[in-house]
A protein has these predicted regions:
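Short, conserved loop/helix-junction motifs that constitute active-site signature segments
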Residues: 54, 99, 125-131, 155-156
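Short, glycine-/small-residue-rich phosphate/pyrophosphate-handling segment
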Residues: 135-174
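C-terminal helix of von Willebrand factor
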Residues: 168-191
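N-terminal trafficking/processing presequences and adjacent post-cleavage segments
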Residues: 185-221
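Bacterial N-terminal signal peptides that target proteins for export
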Residues: 1-7
Protein backbone atom coordinates (compact mmCIF):
# COMPACT_ATOMS: atom_id res chain seq x y z
CA UNK A 1 0.00 0.00 0.00
CA UNK A 2 2.81 2.33 0.94
CA UNK A 3 4.59 1.48 -2.30
CA UNK A 4 1.43 2.24 -4.26
CA UNK A 5 1.05 5.65 -2.59
CA UNK A 6 4.72 6.41 -3.20
CA UNK A 7 4.41 5.55 -6.87
CA UNK A 8 1.33 7.76 -7.23
CA UNK A 9 3.15 10.65 -5.54
CA UNK A 10 6.15 10.24 -7.83
CA UNK A 11 3.84 10.22 -10.85
CA UNK A 12 2.20 13.49 -9.76
CA UNK A 13 5.59 15.12 -9.15
CA UNK A 14 6.85 13.93 -12.54
CA UNK A 15 3.79 15.27 -14.37
CA UNK A 16 4.08 18.59 -12.56
CA UNK A 17 7.75 18.87 -13.47
CA UNK A 18 7.02 18.07 -17.12
CA UNK A 19 4.18 20.57 -17.15
CA UNK A 20 6.36 23.30 -15.65
CA UNK A 21 9.23 22.45 -17.92
CA UNK A 22 7.11 22.73 -21.06
CA UNK A 23 5.57 26.08 -20.05
CA UNK A 24 6.98 28.97 -22.14
CA UNK A 25 6.91 32.59 -21.08
CA UNK A 26 6.10 35.09 -23.80
CA UNK A 27 9.11 37.41 -24.07
CA UNK A 28 8.33 41.06 -23.52
CA UNK A 29 8.95 43.27 -26.52
CA UNK A 30 11.69 45.75 -25.75
CA UNK A 31 10.74 49.41 -26.03
CA UNK A 32 12.62 51.20 -28.80
CA UNK A 33 15.54 53.28 -27.57
CA UNK A 34 14.97 56.92 -28.45
CA UNK A 35 17.23 59.95 -28.80
CA UNK A 36 16.17 63.57 -29.14
CA UNK A 37 18.87 65.36 -31.12
CA UNK A 38 18.47 69.01 -32.05
CA UNK A 39 20.04 72.29 -33.13
CA UNK A 40 18.62 75.51 -31.71
CA UNK A 41 19.81 79.08 -32.11
CA UNK A 42 17.22 81.09 -30.21
CA UNK A 43 15.93 78.44 -27.80
CA UNK A 44 12.62 77.77 -29.58
CA UNK A 45 13.64 74.39 -30.99
CA UNK A 46 15.29 73.56 -27.67
CA UNK A 47 11.94 74.07 -25.93
CA UNK A 48 10.26 71.58 -28.28
CA UNK A 49 13.14 69.10 -27.88
CA UNK A 50 12.93 69.21 -24.10
CA UNK A 51 9.15 68.77 -24.18
CA UNK A 52 9.50 65.64 -26.34
CA UNK A 53 12.37 64.19 -24.29
CA UNK A 54 10.54 64.78 -21.00
CA UNK A 55 7.38 63.10 -22.26
CA UNK A 56 9.21 60.06 -23.60
CA UNK A 57 12.00 59.78 -21.05
CA UNK A 58 14.37 59.83 -24.02
CA UNK A 59 18.03 60.77 -24.13
CA UNK A 60 18.65 64.29 -25.41
CA UNK A 61 21.62 66.10 -26.95
CA UNK A 62 22.17 69.42 -28.67
CA UNK A 63 24.10 69.92 -31.91
CA UNK A 64 26.56 72.72 -31.13
CA UNK A 65 28.56 74.88 -33.52
CA UNK A 66 32.29 75.53 -33.11
CA UNK A 67 31.71 79.17 -34.08
CA UNK A 68 28.07 79.95 -33.17
CA UNK A 69 25.96 82.32 -35.22
CA UNK A 70 25.50 85.90 -34.08
CA UNK A 71 22.37 86.31 -31.91
CA UNK A 72 21.26 89.07 -34.28
CA UNK A 73 18.82 87.62 -36.83
CA UNK A 74 19.99 89.67 -39.80
CA UNK A 75 23.64 88.93 -39.05
CA UNK A 76 22.82 85.21 -39.07
CA UNK A 77 20.98 85.50 -42.38
CA UNK A 78 23.88 87.42 -43.93
CA UNK A 79 26.39 84.80 -42.77
CA UNK A 80 24.25 81.94 -44.06
CA UNK A 81 23.89 83.59 -47.47
CA UNK A 82 27.63 84.17 -47.67
CA UNK A 83 28.34 80.55 -46.67
CA UNK A 84 25.86 79.32 -49.31
CA UNK A 85 27.53 81.39 -52.01
CA UNK A 86 30.93 79.97 -51.04
CA UNK A 87 29.67 76.42 -50.57
CA UNK A 88 30.72 76.41 -46.92
CA UNK A 89 29.01 74.57 -44.06
CA UNK A 90 29.53 75.48 -40.39
CA UNK A 91 31.76 73.27 -38.28
CA UNK A 92 30.08 71.51 -35.35
CA UNK A 93 31.41 69.89 -32.20
CA UNK A 94 31.35 66.07 -32.07
CA UNK A 95 28.03 64.59 -30.99
CA UNK A 96 28.52 62.37 -27.95
CA UNK A 97 25.55 60.07 -28.56
CA UNK A 98 26.21 56.99 -30.70
CA UNK A 99 23.42 56.86 -33.29
CA UNK A 100 24.00 53.11 -33.67
CA UNK A 101 22.63 52.58 -30.14
CA UNK A 102 19.20 54.07 -30.93
CA UNK A 103 16.15 52.87 -32.83
CA UNK A 104 14.28 56.18 -33.13
CA UNK A 105 15.89 59.59 -33.46
CA UNK A 106 13.82 62.74 -33.04
CA UNK A 107 15.72 65.30 -35.10
CA UNK A 108 14.94 68.95 -34.38
CA UNK A 109 15.89 72.15 -36.15
CA UNK A 110 14.77 75.66 -37.06
CA UNK A 111 13.74 76.08 -40.69
CA UNK A 112 15.92 78.54 -42.61
CA UNK A 113 15.57 79.17 -46.33
CA UNK A 114 12.92 76.48 -46.59
CA UNK A 115 14.89 73.64 -45.00
CA UNK A 116 16.78 72.56 -41.88
CA UNK A 117 19.46 74.93 -40.60
CA UNK A 118 23.04 74.45 -41.92
CA UNK A 119 24.47 72.90 -38.71
CA UNK A 120 22.03 70.01 -39.20
CA UNK A 121 23.28 69.57 -42.76
CA UNK A 122 26.82 69.34 -41.39
CA UNK A 123 25.75 66.64 -38.95
CA UNK A 124 23.80 64.65 -41.55
CA UNK A 125 26.82 64.61 -43.85
CA UNK A 126 28.79 62.61 -41.29
CA UNK A 127 26.08 60.52 -39.60
CA UNK A 128 24.79 57.09 -40.59
CA UNK A 129 21.05 56.67 -40.09
CA UNK A 130 20.76 53.42 -42.05
CA UNK A 131 17.96 51.28 -40.62
CA UNK A 132 16.90 54.00 -38.18
CA UNK A 133 13.57 55.78 -37.81
CA UNK A 134 13.78 59.58 -37.90
CA UNK A 135 11.03 61.79 -36.51
CA UNK A 136 11.65 65.38 -37.66
CA UNK A 137 10.44 68.33 -35.62
CA UNK A 138 10.99 71.99 -36.27
CA UNK A 139 10.21 75.61 -35.51
CA UNK A 140 9.69 78.19 -38.22
CA UNK A 141 8.49 81.65 -39.11
CA UNK A 142 5.83 80.54 -41.58
CA UNK A 143 6.45 76.92 -42.58
CA UNK A 144 8.95 74.47 -44.00
CA UNK A 145 8.33 71.10 -42.33
CA UNK A 146 7.20 69.48 -45.58
CA UNK A 147 10.13 70.76 -47.66
CA UNK A 148 12.58 69.83 -44.89
CA UNK A 149 11.22 66.28 -44.79
CA UNK A 150 11.79 65.95 -48.54
CA UNK A 151 15.39 67.12 -48.16
CA UNK A 152 15.89 64.79 -45.20
CA UNK A 153 14.68 61.80 -47.22
CA UNK A 154 17.23 62.61 -49.92
CA UNK A 155 20.04 63.12 -47.39
CA UNK A 156 19.28 59.89 -45.50
CA UNK A 157 17.89 57.34 -48.00
CA UNK A 158 18.64 54.44 -45.66
CA UNK A 159 16.41 55.79 -42.90
CA UNK A 160 12.65 55.66 -42.47
CA UNK A 161 11.29 59.19 -42.14
CA UNK A 162 8.21 59.20 -39.91
CA UNK A 163 5.56 61.95 -39.71
CA UNK A 164 6.95 65.13 -38.17
CA UNK A 165 5.84 68.05 -36.03
CA UNK A 166 6.30 71.76 -36.70
CA UNK A 167 5.24 74.93 -34.94
CA UNK A 168 5.55 78.63 -35.65
CA UNK A 169 7.84 80.43 -33.24
CA UNK A 170 5.00 82.92 -32.73
CA UNK A 171 2.76 80.07 -31.48
CA UNK A 172 5.18 78.39 -29.09
CA UNK A 173 2.66 78.62 -26.25
CA UNK A 174 0.50 76.08 -28.11
CA UNK A 175 3.39 73.62 -28.42
CA UNK A 176 3.05 71.53 -25.20
CA UNK A 177 -0.52 70.51 -25.97
CA UNK A 178 0.27 69.91 -29.65
CA UNK A 179 3.33 67.79 -28.79
CA UNK A 180 1.21 65.60 -26.50
CA UNK A 181 -1.35 65.11 -29.27
CA UNK A 182 1.39 64.40 -31.83
CA UNK A 183 3.16 61.79 -29.68
CA UNK A 184 -0.08 59.99 -28.82
CA UNK A 185 -1.37 60.08 -32.41
CA UNK A 186 1.85 58.51 -33.68
CA UNK A 187 2.02 55.77 -31.06
CA UNK A 188 4.85 57.08 -28.88
CA UNK A 189 2.61 57.73 -25.88
CA UNK A 190 -0.56 56.12 -24.61
CA UNK A 191 -3.66 58.23 -24.28
CA UNK A 192 -6.50 59.83 -26.16
CA UNK A 193 -5.92 62.36 -28.91
CA UNK A 194 -7.99 64.58 -31.12
CA UNK A 195 -8.31 63.10 -34.62
CA UNK A 196 -9.51 65.79 -36.99
CA UNK A 197 -11.75 65.17 -39.97
CA UNK A 198 -10.33 65.59 -43.47
CA UNK A 199 -10.84 68.95 -45.12
CA UNK A 200 -13.72 68.91 -47.63
CA UNK A 201 -13.32 70.14 -51.21
CA UNK A 202 -12.40 73.81 -51.33
CA UNK A 203 -14.82 76.46 -52.53
CA UNK A 204 -14.36 80.07 -53.57
CA UNK A 205 -13.57 82.16 -50.53
CA UNK A 206 -16.41 84.45 -49.46
CA UNK A 207 -15.83 88.03 -48.34
CA UNK A 208 -16.04 86.94 -44.70
CA UNK A 209 -13.59 84.08 -45.22
CA UNK A 210 -11.21 86.36 -47.12
CA UNK A 211 -11.37 88.75 -44.16
CA UNK A 212 -10.36 85.90 -41.83
CA UNK A 213 -7.37 85.18 -44.07
CA UNK A 214 -6.34 88.85 -44.19
CA UNK A 215 -6.58 89.16 -40.41
CA UNK A 216 -4.49 86.02 -39.88
CA UNK A 217 -1.57 87.09 -42.08
CA UNK A 218 -1.73 90.81 -41.28
CA UNK A 219 1.63 92.12 -40.16
CA UNK A 220 3.62 89.12 -41.37
CA UNK A 221 6.02 90.49 -44.03
CA UNK A 222 6.65 87.21 -45.88
CA UNK A 223 3.01 86.72 -46.87
CA UNK A 224 1.57 89.14 -49.41
CA UNK A 225 -1.29 87.17 -50.89
CA UNK A 226 -5.00 87.10 -51.65
CA UNK A 227 -7.31 84.26 -50.59
CA UNK A 228 -8.67 82.33 -53.57
CA UNK A 229 -10.39 79.17 -52.29
CA UNK A 230 -10.93 77.67 -48.85
CA UNK A 231 -12.15 74.65 -46.89
CA UNK A 232 -12.77 74.38 -43.16
CA UNK A 233 -13.15 71.78 -40.43
CA UNK A 234 -14.16 71.83 -36.79
CA UNK A 235 -11.65 71.95 -33.96
CA UNK A 236 -12.48 71.11 -30.33
CA UNK A 237 -12.37 74.82 -29.53
CA UNK A 238 -12.91 76.55 -32.86
CA UNK A 239 -12.42 76.21 -36.62
CA UNK A 240 -9.44 75.49 -38.85
CA UNK A 241 -9.29 76.86 -42.40
CA UNK A 242 -7.14 75.72 -45.30
CA UNK A 243 -6.76 78.57 -47.78
CA UNK A 244 -5.31 78.44 -51.24
CA UNK A 245 -3.99 81.94 -51.87
CA UNK A 246 -2.22 83.69 -54.72
CA UNK A 247 0.96 85.63 -54.02
CA UNK A 248 0.68 89.23 -55.16
CA UNK A 249 3.48 91.21 -56.84
CA UNK A 250 5.62 93.30 -54.48
CA UNK A 251 7.48 96.44 -55.39
CA UNK A 252 9.95 96.00 -52.53
CA UNK A 253 10.65 92.36 -53.46
CA UNK A 254 10.16 91.95 -57.22
CA UNK A 255 11.89 88.55 -57.18
CA UNK A 256 9.23 87.04 -54.89
CA UNK A 257 7.23 84.32 -56.73
CA UNK A 258 3.58 85.00 -57.54
CA UNK A 259 2.48 81.37 -57.46
CA UNK A 260 -0.14 79.76 -55.22
CA UNK A 261 0.44 78.91 -51.59
CA UNK A 262 -1.55 77.00 -48.98
CA UNK A 263 -2.13 78.71 -45.65
CA UNK A 264 -3.56 77.04 -42.54
CA UNK A 265 -5.50 79.36 -40.23
CA UNK A 266 -7.13 78.63 -36.87
CA UNK A 267 -9.85 80.67 -35.21
CA UNK A 268 -10.33 79.64 -31.61
CA UNK A 269 -13.38 80.72 -29.66
CA UNK A 270 -13.24 84.42 -28.77
CA UNK A 271 -9.75 84.77 -30.31
CA UNK A 272 -8.39 86.46 -33.42
CA UNK A 273 -7.46 84.39 -36.50
CA UNK A 274 -3.89 83.04 -36.50
CA UNK A 275 -2.07 81.30 -39.33
CA UNK A 276 -0.27 78.14 -38.24
CA UNK A 277 1.78 77.29 -41.32
CA UNK A 278 2.34 77.98 -44.99
CA UNK A 279 3.10 75.37 -47.66
CA UNK A 280 4.76 76.86 -50.71
Amino acid sequence: MKNTKLMLLLAVVTLTAVSCGSKKETPKEEAPKMLVLYYSQTGNTKAVAEAIANKLGADIEEITMVDPYDPDFQATIDRCKKDQEQGVLPEILPVKADIANYDVIFLGFPVWFGTYAPPVTTFLNSADFSGKKIVPFCTFGSGGLESSVKDLAVAEPGAEILPGYGVRAARLEAMPKEVDNFLIANGFLEGEYVQLADFPVQHEASADEAAIFDAAVDGYPMIHAKAKTVASRDLPDGTEYLFTAVNLPREDKPDMPTDEIQVYVTVEKDKAPVFTKVIR
